[in-house]
């Protein structure tokens, strides 16, 4: 087989469909978020405003977080020095797990190298180790959850997205004696809709199922202390496992689960994705602790963030720019064409100094291509007006459909 020819042909198909991914070469400017420096292929540099960061609250630039990380490097050095089991458990890891358990009102927590790994390792381990387990997975769950369930090789039942009737029908049809787990997200990353957590917990109680809630797009963002949608709705105690990330609203890196002492110890003891990898650097753990502690105490970032989301949506509506209506902070501006979506993104970056990454298939279904915009507390009124003005101009240029008020 001509491997190079195969690779080239497969890549060419992405180019021809307008969905080949190109990384924007940018450098975040410390203390100047959401500004960044863009490096062109010819070596030229240009300032841009980032509108697609998952550093939702700008905590990656927060002075408390940065100082905590610097202090940890000065105190501990760069890396953890090993796996958690072999010399890699630094005291910062222990403190971080205590902080996370407290955030979600759980007995225990366990940190991983990323949110992807925490989902993959936890769901895969549960699927492998619990005899006869059936995992009921929402149809729009993240790839890390899908891959984890697949890795677990247990029975998997897909239920229609956020459809309680379909979930109950599938629970009712399953073996009543089989162990069950319902896996779902709180805020879904591409459409920005929110799961009916209470009603799912009611079904879990009725059919004797565990619950696994991915809160990666909600932790830090919702609830009086940033514990997510489950905290906001007073439901944390009803969930078996709450999973989250340190790399979005908390502005650092890593993933975690929280739950009972027994379930966290079970994953710690059996999950290969936890056991056989180097622990997070102590500096990242220190930064995460500072970020979590700040957001537990400060409502300012969350309130300001919601204000920015409302401002952006209002201006988009005024210009007839179609965006998906949802109750979260994620603002998907709908284009519906892969080539046009990429073209708009390119022109925004090259001509307007606005960086928004196009979202195309397979991340979203074909004909639902979009610009996934994520306002932050640090975007000004002028930033928002500049973004919407540029979109208005490009919408007319592409003859794209306008939203009707």
UniProtKB/Swiss-Prot annotation:
Domain of life of the native organism: Bacteria
The protein's required cofactors: pyridoxal 5'-phosphate
Reactions this protein catalyses: succinyl-CoA + glycine + H(+) = 5-aminolevulinate + CO2 + CoA
Gene3D superfamilies recorded: Aspartate Aminotransferase, domain 1, Type I PLP-dependent aspartate aminotransferase-like (Major domain)
Positions contributing to pyridoxal 5'-phosphate binding: 189, 217, 245, 277-278
InterPro entries cross-referenced by the UniProt entry: 4pyrrol_synth_NH2levulA_synth (IPR010961), Aminotrans_II_pyridoxalP_BS (IPR001917), Aminotransferase_I/II_large (IPR004839), AON_synthase_class-II (IPR050087), PyrdxlP-dep_Trfase (IPR015424), PyrdxlP-dep_Trfase_major (IPR015421), PyrdxlP-dep_Trfase_small (IPR015422)
N6-(pyridoxal phosphate)lysine: modified positions: 248
Keyword Transferase applies: yes
Coiled-coil region: none
Catalytic activity, EC: 2.3.1.37
Assembly notes: Homodimer.
Similarity annotation: Belongs to the class-II pyridoxal-phosphate-dependent aminotransferase family.
Protein name: 5-aminolevulinate synthase
Protein species of origin: Rhizobium radiobacter (Agrobacterium tumefaciens)
